[in-house]
Amino acid sequence: MSNYKIKCTTYGGKIGWFLRKHFSQYTSCAYLKLQFALRRKLYKNYIKLFNQRAAENNCFLPCLISIETINRCNSSCSFCPANIKNETRPFQKMDEALFKKIIAELKELNYSGYLNLYVNNEPFMDKRIEDWYRYAKEQLPKAKMLLYTNGTLLTEERFCKIIPYIDKMIINNYTTTMSLHPNVQKLFNFVKNTKEYWNKDITIQIRYINEILTNRSGVAPNKKELMYNNEICVMPFTDFTIYPNGTVGLCCSDATEKTCLGNINNESIFSVWTGKTYQNLREKIANGRSNYPFCKGCDFVDAGIRNMFIKQQLK
């Protein structure tokens, strides 16, 4: 039996849930301080290696490329600036020709990192998402297809259609009661009882919908206060974020698309990634977030995928 049989996590069980629900401000602060401390040396070492490789014209490609195919979500998470109640961006869907241009460029680069068709949205609001993941996987067999979803639109039919092309699926089950959404519960039961999917890496994360997390550079609805710090951030060295109109944003924390590092409609992924705008950003961030206007008050901490990639490169 595979170790990948569908998993559920609550981040600390009932005690963790109680603390996040009733003392969310404190748990957020404690978590962030701990994570910054744990990551500081790791990030410095990776940035040093990244810059060495770049100087030798052998720059690391992004470990995570995120493509937002539609800029809408159907959830109301209080910590997210792109939730259904707070969304301020004009509605946009990515043109298919632009998507295929992106995939063609990644194919030419022999891309083998993570590809995620999601940024600040719900992927299954785009009815093309199953076909686009299939196309991406067929064109980029070495890439690891990553999918984040809240699961509310993920039926058995859509799951069966998309899962052959997904390497890692994370279902963020947002709730107030520490229970699974009815749709997610149905999916959990289906996968649990269908052996052909037991070798798939699927995790359901049971998350408190009103939890205080990070300020996302001041745009998180329930945590707008900025936390001025001089911590470095690794995301300019690991992430490449593309919005539906082709704009390359700084990172997923830029949920209102204030930053622009280039546009894939008239530039290539590689030219943007290795270009002067990105290089100037990295030089500033490598010396602390306070050196870049958008980042100086941000307290966002990266997820585990980046850490795994960094540790592999530093071996």
What are these regions (language model features)?
Residues 2-168, 181, 305-311, 315:
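Conserved alpha-helical substructure of the radical SAM core
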Residues 52-56, 225-229, 237, 284-286:
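Short, P/G- and charge-enriched loop/turn segments at secondary-structure junctions
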Residues 63, 236, 255:
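Exposed loop/turn and edge beta-strand positions of beta-sandwich/beta-sheet ligand-binding modules
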Residues 73, 77-80, 233, 251-252, ...:
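Short cysteine clusters
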